[in-house]
Structures are given as structure tokens and as C-alpha cells.
Amino acid sequence: MTISSLPSAGRVPTGAQAPLGAAGGWPPPSTSAASRFGTEIVRLHTRMTFRGLPDMIEGEPIVRIVGLGDGLTTIAVRESQLPSRYLRGVMGFRLAQFLHIGWMDPDIAYRRGLYHEPLTSAAGPQTIHTLTLTAEGRIAGYVALVGSPDTAGKALDAPDRGLFPAERAHRVELLSAFSAPGRTTHNVYEIKRFVRDRFMERGPVSERVPWHLMLALGRTALALSDEIQVVCGDSRENGALRHLRLVGFEPLVIDDTRPSLPHDELMWPSYEQPQLAKPFAGVVPGDLAGYMDAIASGLELACAPGWQGAAVGRFLEVRASSADGPEAMAA
């Protein structure tokens, strides 16, 4: 199924599929109708292909990574660069992935007739979408950088600035420690929806997807260094936090929070998991380019044995060469 086959509105048909909870989702839906609906949403989006997407974006992508011998193509684009039908497809991928793992509420999706995450107009900076596509055009991985809700940038320690989603969920303030002259909330982005396709066959190619995403994130920060100075979010220790530390970030992490969202928000189940995410924020390190070169050098070995070890070896070299540790960009 191609992206042009995506429904234009309303609910997709339900069918006699395995219930959503059978795939390991949590919490199980409270009604069989919601279960069937959620299962069909997942089934619909696992058949979607986006083969033409790289050639359909408006203008040049912020980042394009291709030709590394693994058949993967990774692009980073601002939301306005995505044609509407592709944007809906990308948001549908997000919905399907997080319904499948139980981090979104299938009852809400069913009641609202959602086949993709709701589209919202950004009051501040546009969302930056990063996608890794297979040779067949399937989305293999995804991550978003979400900007501040402030229409105009405000100082990071301004008492009336808008909160980022992670701050709202954890009821913490993350940014005042990174306040600096000329740095505003429009220089901060939250990392969200970092995910590898849960249905992708595990193997040498799937192992490379998170590295593609991290390389694209880093190159995006380098390309937009005046704009992206601080990142924040929430993550489990073995998730985005681990990846960020590996590439030179020294994030401020707040432990022992009790995150939650109102039960009328689609993502509320994500904060009622056995292992909870921790909120974090950190300045983009000054030696980020070296770490990105290290990832690229590993990925350029294609799927040859030991490519990950080669990349990690380069990381250690970069770290050793930074006598004073990571320095902040645009400090």
C-alpha cells in the first residue's frame, strides 16, 4: 500500500484481527471495538510505503544520508517541507508504533476515529521530522525535534515562558540552568518519538537504524547551530539518554519524578509503565562534529562485521581529544 492509499478522514474498517494486547501492548483496551480498531490501525500502517517521499519534499532537506551500503535513506526536514499526505502518513506511523507497544490509548484513538496522531499548528518553531526509510520505502525509524510553544522566544529563565511537553508531564523546570545571553526558548528543541520500527526484521540492517537517526540528529544540530543550542526531553536510561551521552552530551537529568498526563490525552499510558522515563536537558556539545564523523565512519563500513566497534573506537578517540570535555555551542 502506498501513501496515496491513506484514508482522507474517519475510521478505517475493523476486522477479525488479533487483539492489540496480544502484541504486548499495555494497557489492554477496555472494549473489543477499541482493540479491533487499534489492531487495524497498526495493520494499515505496517503496509504503508513512502518510496517517493525523498523526492517530494519542498526544497532541500536539512540532512540527507544515503549511499552507505545498507539500502537505508535518512532525511531531516521541517514540517512545512512535507506534503500533507506524507505528513499524515508519518503521523500515522507514529500512532501505529506507539499503539503497538502500549504507550498510546486505543480507546481514545477509537473514540476520535484517529488513523494518525493529531496534527497541530506550531505557535513557535516548526517541528523537525527525521525519518529513516528502507529501499522499499518503509519507515524504519523516526525521531522528532519539537520547538517551544512560545510565539516569540523568551529567556530560558523567564517565569512566563511556555513549558515543553516533558516539563509538563514531569512537573519540572529544565531550562533555567542553561540560560545565557541571547539564548531563548526558540533555541531549544525537545527530542520526541524516538523509535525504530517494531515490525522490522531484526538483523544487520535494523541495527543501523538508531545510528542513522543519531547521525541525522547531530548533523541537523550542526547545520542549524545558531538555532539549536539546547535539547531536552525524557527517556529511559537505555533509550535516548544513552545515545546522547555516547555522542558527547552531558545532560542534566532529574531523578525520582512522578510523570503523568490527563487520561484524555492520547499518550497518557506511556507514563504508567514499569520503567519510567527521566526528564533531561543539555547543551549541544562543541565537539559534536567529531562524534558525527565517528558515526559516519562506522556506517561507511556498511554491514561488515565490527562496524559498531569501529564507531565506538572513534567515539573514544574524540572523547580523549577533548581535553576539557564537551564545550557548548553558542555559549
Q: Predicted regions span which residues?
A:
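Long, hydrophobic, well-ordered secondary-structure blocks that form the structural core
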Residues: 144-151
